[in-house]
């Protein structure tokens, strides 16, 4: 059977449009007991399929991905399902077209008004579309979907924007790499694009939104971007693909998928396995040294992949992106747009369960919306206003209350706790009141017995209570603030002069949602009390490290020099 589904001389793989057809709106058939009835609503077609005059679409299915829905098959048995007449030119005369199982509307892919499936092994090899099967394929033929696209298609905005990357306007001959504008046109055959190959698919890396966090009053310094090594953590990234094949390629973002040093250490560790696979040499150039692809450990891979690797920014040429990605590439945010972006290459796993990415994205958005609403409801306008005013600079860190009129060394005085809070102080230190002196005499002898045995001990009259207003006036508290970069020894000595001090949070009990303030206070208290021991342990660790490095260097220098065959001299 000749190849079908060509448009402009380009064969379509995995999905083909083969013919135009019409259907009567009242044309239905009764759904009988089916051995294979998958749920194909999430089977997304490229947008060019919705613009072609050919309405009949054929797509290869995978039984381990598009599994049989036994519950739906039993429920819809006996229901009326839309159907259409298959054109005689689609299959040979000996094709068992009567074994097609037409599907209910709710189980059809988006944009289809009718469609059916041939189960695994139903179609013989000579009846299966050659565009959708490899020549070296062995075993029974995979299932096949044959559907009739609707005339008027209305897709959701999110799906429509996702399909925009496949839009190919008529008459557009320039294939421009979207991240690096260029005026050069390339006349090479566009069949080199990975999206048009039968063994590749192009994915979109979708990073799930991170949990909402309040803006920190302590701004971190700007980290200089580097391109020497690139190992991102992709465990929270979903790879959205129009159809699932063995190998998929996706452009990554250095902004949304930054380099993670812990992932780099994991790739160099011998204790953790990094699954590998052979990259096709006809697609990817041989990159060695710093430009070689880095294979990631299993725990840092996206869901549904058995092995994956990443090319760091600048390792692949711009010409490779233009010829291999072409018009199907989606622009991604990058820290440096003067070099080519990083690239993800993954091998899809056929053993694991299929991941419903659209449903997972929806659930994640619902979860983040609830968390955001809860966090925003717990904030007050004053808190948000204070954070917005002091987000760029922070002066204080810890406020100490003492009886001394002057602040200790390394601190500055403030008038009130409100002023300390506005300066950024989050913790306070106060002096604990001394407990009342208790009577240590034997509880078995009461006061009357003491007075009878020791008449010289007369009870002293209780002192008259002093005026509280006068006491507050005489003992005015002094508030001193320490900065975030203050000397910890000076801070500890000032706190030690209070004799008995209490460390607590300033203001609310939990001013920073999502942070264990009790644990943070315990760690700060431990640092203040045991700073000498911590320094000593750190010094011992550094000395041991230096000793091991010097020992390894000496052992390396003692190794005999091995000469190669070219250095050997025969006398």
From Swiss-Prot:
Record field: compositional bias (Acidic residues): 457-471
Family of this protein: Belongs to the DM7 family.
Cystine crosslinks: none
Organism: Drosophila melanogaster
Region feature Disordered, mapped onto this chain: 440-472
Coiled-coil blocks: none
Record InterPro entries: DM7 (IPR006610)
Keyword terms: Repeat
Top-rank taxon, per record: Eukaryota
Protein name (Swiss-Prot/TrEMBL): DM7 family protein CG15332
């Amino acid at each position: 059977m000749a190849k079908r589904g060509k448009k402009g001389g380009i064969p379509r793989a995995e999905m083909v449009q083969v013919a135009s057809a019409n259907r009567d709106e009242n044309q239905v058939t009764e759904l009988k007991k089916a051995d294979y009835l998958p749920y194909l609503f999430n089977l997304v077609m490229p947008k060019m399929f919705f613009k072609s005059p050919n309405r009949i679409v054929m797509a290869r299915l995978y039984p381990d991905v598009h599994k049989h829905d036994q519950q739906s098959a039993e429920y819809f048995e006996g229901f009326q399902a839309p159907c259409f007449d298959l054109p005689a030119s689609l299959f040979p005369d000996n094709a068992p077209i009567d074994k097609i199982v037409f599907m209910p509307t709710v189980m059809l892919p988006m944009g289809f008004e009718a469609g059916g499936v041939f189960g695994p092994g139903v179609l013989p090899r000579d009846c299966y579309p050659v565009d959708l099967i490899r020549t070296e394929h062995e075993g029974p033929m995979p299932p096949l979907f044959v559907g009739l696209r609707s005339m008027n298609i209305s897709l959701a905005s999110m799906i429509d924007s996702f399909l925009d990357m496949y839009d190919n306007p008529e008459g557009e001959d320039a294939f421009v790499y979207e991240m690096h504008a260029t005026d050069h046109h390339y006349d090479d055959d566009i069949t080199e694009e990975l999206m048009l190959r039968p063994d590749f698919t192009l994915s979109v890396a979708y990073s799930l939104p991170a949990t909402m966090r309040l803006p920190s009053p302590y701004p971190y310094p700007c980290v200089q971007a580097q391109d020497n090594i690139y190992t991102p953590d992709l465990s929270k990234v979903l790879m959205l693909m129009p159809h699932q094949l063995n190998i998929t390629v996706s452009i990554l973002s250095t902004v949304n998928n930054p380099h993670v040093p812990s992932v780099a250490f994991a790739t160099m560790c011998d204790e953790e396995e990094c699954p590998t696979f052979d990259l096709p040499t006809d697609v990817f150039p041989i990159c060695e040294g710093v430009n070689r692809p880095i294979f990631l450990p299993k725990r840092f891979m996206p869901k549904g992949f058995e092995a994956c690797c990443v090319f760091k920014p600048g390792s692949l040429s711009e010409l490779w992106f233009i010829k291999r990605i072409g018009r199907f590439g989606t622009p991604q945010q990058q820290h440096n747009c003067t070099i080519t972006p990083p690239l993800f290459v993954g091998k899809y796993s056929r053993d694991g369960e299929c991941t419903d990415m659209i449903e997972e994205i929806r659930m994640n958005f619902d979860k983040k919306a609830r968390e955001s609403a809860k966090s925003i409801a717990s904030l007050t306008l004053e808190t948000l206003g204070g954070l917005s005013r002091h987000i760029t600079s922070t002066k204080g860190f810890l406020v100490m209350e003492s009886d001394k009129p002057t602040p200790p060394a390394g601190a500055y005085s403030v008038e009130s706790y409100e002023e300390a809070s506005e300066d950024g102080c989050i913790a306070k230190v106060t002096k604990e009141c001394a407990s009342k002196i208790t009577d240590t005499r034997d509880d078995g002898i009461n006061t009357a017995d003491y007075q009878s045995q020791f008449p010289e001990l007369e009870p002293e009259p209780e002192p008259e209570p002093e005026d509280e207003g006068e006491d507050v006036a005489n003992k005015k508290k002094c508030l001193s603030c320490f900065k975030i970069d203050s000397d910890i020894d000076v801070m500890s000595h000032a706190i030690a002069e209070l004799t008995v001090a209490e460390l607590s949070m300033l203001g609310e009990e939990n001013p920073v949602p999502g942070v264990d303030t009790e644990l943070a206070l315990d760690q700060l208290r431990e640092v203040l009390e045991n700073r000498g021991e911590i320094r000593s342990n750190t010094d011992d660790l550094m000395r041991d490290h230096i000793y091991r490095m010097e020992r390894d260097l000496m052992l390396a220098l003692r190794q005999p020099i091995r000469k190669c065959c070219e250095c050997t001299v025969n006398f």
